[in-house]
Amino acid sequence: MASQGTKRSYEQMETDGERQNATEIRASVGKMIDGIGRFYIQMCTELKLSDYEGRLIQNSLTIERMVLSAFDERRNRYLEEHPSAGKDPKKTGGPIYKRVGGRWMRELVLYDKEEIRRIWRQANNGDDATRGLTHMMIWHSNLNDTTYQRTRALVRTGMDPRMCSLMQGSTLPRRSGAAGAAVKGIGTMVMELIRMIKRGINDRNFWRGENGRKTRSAYERMCNILKGKFQTAAQRAMMDQVRESRNPGNAEIEDLIFSARSALILRGSVAHKSCLPACVYGPAVSSGYDFEKEGYSLVGIDPFKLLQNSQVYSLIRPNENPAHKSQLVWMACHSAAFEDLRLLSFIRGTKVSPRGKLSTRGVQIASNENMDNMESSTLELRSRYWAIRTRSGGNTNQQRASAGQISVQPTFSVQRNLPFEKSTVMAAFTGNTEGRTSDMRAEIIRLMEGAKPEEVSFRGRGVFELSDEKATNPIVPSFDMSNEGSYFFGDNAEEYDN
């Protein structure tokens, strides 16, 4: 990793701390988890939820969304200035599911945002605890990444649906700060920039005046974040070009799409964190576990240990498979939507299947769905091994990948070769190497052609037994390379709709 020294670790981003040592970081992340847990316990009390109802992931999502909406200042301001019929800008709520007379009932609750903010601050020692809020946003984002394939969004910005492995964090709100930026994939950053450039093309005042100055600095900041994710000089030089453009337009969009495509082989570094639902933290805190005292890390064994000892339930629709629902949530918990399925199967200890083979829809239940035949079941979120999360893209090499998704973005730092469909990717690079970025383009193509199938990423890194907390004995897995490695293989996952 170039410039490793200048980058803050993500625990530092997570804790807005300058230079902290490992113990301080662990305590600081633990404190954030404690706050989420305490808030969740208090909300379950307010809503009079039984222990079982409090461990229902659908209730967790509603409670998380309520607090995120209560702190969404921009949207709150917008709602007050543009009142819409039947929507009280000062209130927030959602569906809460309760067990009544042997069946599940939906109850719509409504709370004052002010009241929710008070409960949240109280659980966080009077602080706004933005990091805890961001943590929940990342959990929602990881769940979206596992549940939906962003085909439409990719096509709309002129990218190819097969590039879905670059789309981590594409549903994260803009206000998710540095920790949010760290987990966004290359494609997500490119898409945000393209949307911005398109607005500038259609609206001549977009880059002008007082507002235009702010817009411009946001544009340059996003370019720099994207540049920092690339690992080769040529890709970074290309980002400098895009950033310095006087009047960003179609040439820049071309360059951005080119660089996104190149990231299928010359992968960028994207952070991964295991962010769990609030209904996991709540019961742990109420059982007396002190996260701040014990310390916690989002990228080590801690989330695995926590999930080994947690009971989480989910509502199951009549024709859904509970094991498939469990896989979906397990992948989301570990931010593993774009990881190689063979590695995931090894770590989890049960076969992890591509999205299109899962008989399950999303975790959330729409307000018009019939509750009569809803069952609930335990989510199996335990694992056989654990592994360290990575924030590098691994080095780049080649192996046959699938029709749907043609590359992976590694989540775990474990030795393997990373699959991608070289011929498919390279086919997109014929022709257009003229223009001002021609030398960079030529260099990027040269690097991609040099990528070798035999090359191993994360050499010597392995998975660990759950009893091996200090990560002393790496177990390097061996894979059956004939198996399918991509999750969104020629896929029919539903679209994500806001």
Swiss-Prot record:
Mod. after translation: Late in virus-infected cells, may be cleaved from a 56-kDa protein to a 53-kDa protein by a cellular caspase. This cleavage might be a marker for the onset of apoptosis in infected cells or have a specific function in virus host interaction.
UniProt record, GO biological process: symbiont entry into host cell; viral penetration into host nucleus
InterPro entries in the cross-refs: Flu_NP
Name of the featured protein: Nucleoprotein
Major localization class: virion
Motif (Unconventional nuclear localization signal): 1-18
Database matches in SUPFAM superfamilies: flu NP-like (SSF161003)
Swiss-Prot/TrEMBL keywords: Capsid protein, Helical capsid protein, Host nucleus, Host-virus interaction, Ribonucleoprotein, RNA-binding, Viral nucleoprotein, Viral penetration into host nucleus, Virion, Virus entry into host cell
UniProt cross-references to Pfam families, sorted A to Z: Flu_NP
Function: Encapsidates the negative strand viral RNA, protecting it from nucleases. The encapsidated genomic RNA is termed the ribonucleoprotein (RNP) and serves as template for transcription and replication. The RNP needs to be localized in the host nucleus to start an infectious cycle, but is too large to diffuse through the nuclear pore complex. NP comprises at least 2 nuclear localization signals that are responsible for the active RNP import into the nucleus through cellular importin alpha/beta pathway.
Subunit structure: Homomultimerizes to form the nucleocapsid. May bind host exportin-1/XPO1. Binds to viral genomic RNA. Protein-RNA contacts are mediated by a combination of electrostatic interactions between positively charged residues and the phosphate backbone and planar interactions between aromatic side chains and bases.
Spans annotated as Disordered: 1-21
Keyword flag Ribonucleoprotein: yes
